Amino acid sequence: MFDYLENEEVALDELKQMLRDRDPNDTRNQFKNNALHAYLFNEHCNNVEVVKLLLDSGTNPLHKNWRQLTPLGEYTNSRHGKVNKDIAMVLLEATGYSNINDFNIFTYMKSKNVDIDLIKVLVEHGFDFSVKCEKHHSVIENYVMTDDPVPEIIDLFIENGCSVIYEDEDDEYGYAYEEYHSQNDDYQPRNCGTVLHLYIISHLYSESDSRSCVNPEVVKCLINHGINPSSIDKNYCTALQYYIKSSHIDIDIVKLLMKGIDNTAYSYIDDLTCCTRGIMADYLNSDYRYNKDVDLDLVKLFLENGKPHGIMCSIVPLWRNDKETISLILKTMNSDVLQHILIEYITFSDIDISLVEYMLEYGAVVNKEAIHGYFKNINIDSYTMKYLLKKEGGDAVNHLDDGEIPIGHLCKSNYGRYNFYTDTYRQGFRDMSYACPILSTINICLPYLKDINMIDKRGETLLHKAVRYNKQSLVSLLLESGSDVNIRSNNGYTCIAIAINESRNIELLNMLLCHKPTLDCVIDSLREISNIVDNAYAIKQCIRYAMIIDDCISSKIPESISKHYNDYIDICNQELNEMKKIIVGGNTMFSLIFTDHGAKIIHRYANNPELRAYYESKQNKIYVEVYDIISNAIVKHNKIHKNIESVDDNTYISNLPYTIKYKIFEQQ
């Protein structure tokens, strides 16, 4: 009988005959099934009268087989494509609905004939809708993933214990935190986001006639029950970001899914692919879009609700591979939006001039804001800078950017990857090749700068910034271009004080001292030195320079410094006084060494006994550079003398007096 019930088309008369001498509750078979189990496992069980007959014959509707399933559980767990409502009702009524939670709601939802009246019966008799399936999805989550969920049934589920608002819905993620801490070690955190995410993702593509695409009524239903469309899943995606991958996109559904999203052009970098992602970015990227062609009406909707930075980030990565689409999008923008996008592009992206040209063609302009933005771009290059300045006219470099000198942004530490400090400079020569991109860019800007000593809101010049950020080649360029070493900032800081206190760079300090700051500037700098012990070498450099200007400076030096460096000051005085006493050809040794005029004529006295004696004594301990200056003068003199002697006797120069010939060759 059991084989007959399980495998054949059951006839009532034949079954009645079998039941006369067979026990329907005989469960000695290997599966511990009773007669109801056997019939309800039959793929052809569609006759409610058979079920009634078995029940009338005393078959126990609450007996559990080897799988711990009652007949109702076996019926709703089996391979049936459809669950017969009448059979389910008979099994429920036979137990007074005590077996109601044996009903497998998850299997039933996958059947092709979900009956709202049967769902209402389950609701009415206390079915536990908080139950979850093996994959830890709730009833409502499973239902929205079925082929064609019905809003009315969704309402029933939600109104009777199926929550769509997770306990952590207020945070940025739409998935339940508690589920990540299941005691089941095999359980993996789900990645599904909200119920709305699940519904959208499971209905992106119409795989068969029976499976519908996304239904706007279902979307409205879920949103009306409190699901926030702006919630994101673990991949940082909203439901809309998935929906735009759909094979059929309804713009009205897009508008529904946009609720709560204040920027449809927001973007982010995907950790796995390193691609720019986001709603608009994904839609424009053919790798994520189902349809080949872009719907411009949809793009316009995203543009209207997107912010310039996100729009820029969404279109720029696709420019090289899809110029046609991007240019079409640029063409649809109004000039104000396009102008904002141009400024964002110039400020934050690696510039492609061909894209800039398209933006200009469609109404954007390279203005002061655009130039100021480019100075903040960490991907700056001299070629693009030259192009932009030519387009704008170059006047933007002369206007402060929110109180800051525009070019000054290039001095900051975020450009530290570029080598301002070159080997050429280490060897004692100024780096004038401008191989560094930032240095080259500044060199391009300088001709447009009307006042190289323009000050920012703090009273600082470009030179202050270059010194502060330890940009030696840039300091050299600015000094060569006329930057004033003596300018004090609003707080009284000089470039010299910054070099000592902040940069702690002796080479920078020596560069500044070589450009002859005033005595007041040096004294003010000494007053600003914060640590007179650790900065001993720098302080001595300032003292030795200041005493060349005024040997009575000791009374002007801050008392704390003069006391600490009194012996050093005395030695400086001794060496300078000695140079002032030595007369060489009507000039003091001091004037030949430390004045501009002396530097031009010292080589003429290379053979002077007083100069030679002083040179050979090597007595200085502080002003030792004097000997290098004299040595260079002797070399120059010998070269001039050699050139004079090599003159052909048959030339007119050979007949000139030696002093005249000397003056001629010293100009070479």
Curated annotation (Swiss-Prot):
Subunit text: Interacts (via N-terminus) with host RELA. Interacts (via PRANC/F-box-like domain) with the SKP1 component of the host SCF ubiquitin ligase complex.
PROSITE patterns hit by this protein: ANK_REP_REGION (PS50297), ANK_REPEAT (PS50088)
Repeat positions for ANK: 31-64, 101-131, 135-166, 199-231, 235-266, 277-311, 334-368, 458-487, 491-521
Protein name: Ankyrin repeat domain-containing protein OPG023
Role this protein plays: Substrate-specific adapter of SKP1-containing E3 ubiquitin-protein ligases which mediate the ubiquitination and subsequent proteasomal degradation of host target proteins. Prevents activation and subsequent nuclear localization of NF-kappa-B in infected cells, by targeting NF-kappa-B RELA subunit to the SCF E3 ligase complex.
Region PRANC/F-box-like, residue ranges: 586-666
Similarity comment: Belongs to the orthopoxvirus OPG023 family.
Highest taxon above the source species: Viruses
SMART domains recorded: ANK (SM00248)
Alphabetical keyword list: ANK repeat, Host-virus interaction, Inhibition of host NF-kappa-B by virus, Modulation of host cell cycle by virus, Modulation of host E3 ubiquitin ligases by virus, Modulation of host ubiquitin pathway by virus, Repeat, Ubl conjugation pathway
GO biological process: symbiont-mediated perturbation of host cell cycle progression; symbiont-mediated perturbation of host ubiquitin-like protein modification; symbiont-mediated suppression of host NF-kappaB cascade
